[in-house]
Amino acid sequence: MRHLITTKDFSNGEILALFKEAKEFLDEKPRTFLEGKSVTTIFFENSTRTQSSFETAARRLGAKVLKLDVSRSSSSKGETLFDTAANLDAMAPSAIVVRHKNSGVPHTLANYTHCPIVNGGDGKHAHPTQALLDLFTIMEHFDYNVKGKKIAIVGDIKNSRVAASNLELLPRFGIDITLVAPPHFMPNYPIKKTNKLKEVIDDVDIIMSLRTQTERHNIPTYASLKDYANDFCISKDLIKDKNLIILHPGPVHRNIDISDDVMADKRCKVLTQVKNGVAIRMAVLKKLILES
């Protein structure tokens, strides 16, 4: 049984095949590949973009979707996560998409179910479909000539599962990463690092801005988000007319992560990422369900 828990679960060749199929899915036309199949989504953390994206992807493939409302489920009444998984599995879904605040939950659930598990984000650990859609967006923009391209990942890297997955995936395709963050947001990771965004802005082809994850901070690290923005907001004054693209996994804190004028700039690919995300998740669900 194949699962997607981290980006390591797919080889480079499999990823390129996914991208080829995802490109076809960008036409947004309905398909029947998963007719008669069902996809269950169970999100123990709030999500608008990711959960909606997976549900849209499943429906476009012809699958039925069961969205489990965790706030009303038995898990909120004391049922263990594993009992919830066992009960879901008894309904014989074709795949389960799970998000949880604790790292490792999707991996553990894979031992209690008999269908593919797709990790929709677990703690600070991984968000594989986000990294796949980020790479797909980069690949499409640069016509798949990405070896040697340089990316700055900017912001709350230490607490970001998106960053963790991109740190695993992007170098596999020859993309050079520099981490840009204040010391308390910087992970202990053997890679190029700087605390000053202006030091790298002239050298990069891509900027990936990350949300400041205040919900994962035990104590405040800045007096205000405005103070953080003074050093790390992606603004027009910073990027000027440079030939680069800007990514963000969402939700964007406007004028904290990215300024309003940059959000409206054609170099900002945030909405392209959203569109690409549905296509990538269609390709992932099709692959895992039909190969299981």
Swiss-Prot record:
Concerning its family, UniProt says:
Belongs to the aspartate/ornithine carbamoyltransferase superfamily. ATCase family.
- The answer to keyword Protease applying to this record is no
Q: Alphabetically list the UniProt keywords.
A: Pyrimidine biosynthesis, Transferase
Give the protein's recorded name: Aspartate carbamoyltransferase catalytic subunit
Q: Cross-referenced HAMAP family, in alphabetical order?
A: Asp_carb_tr (MF_00001)
User: Which EC number applies?
Assistant: 2.1.3.2
What species is given as this protein's source? Answer: Campylobacter lari (strain RM2100 / D67 / ATCC BAA-1060)
Fill in the subunit field for this protein. Answer: Heterododecamer (2C3:3R2) of six catalytic PyrB chains organized as two trimers (C3), and six regulatory PyrI chains organized as three dimers (R2).
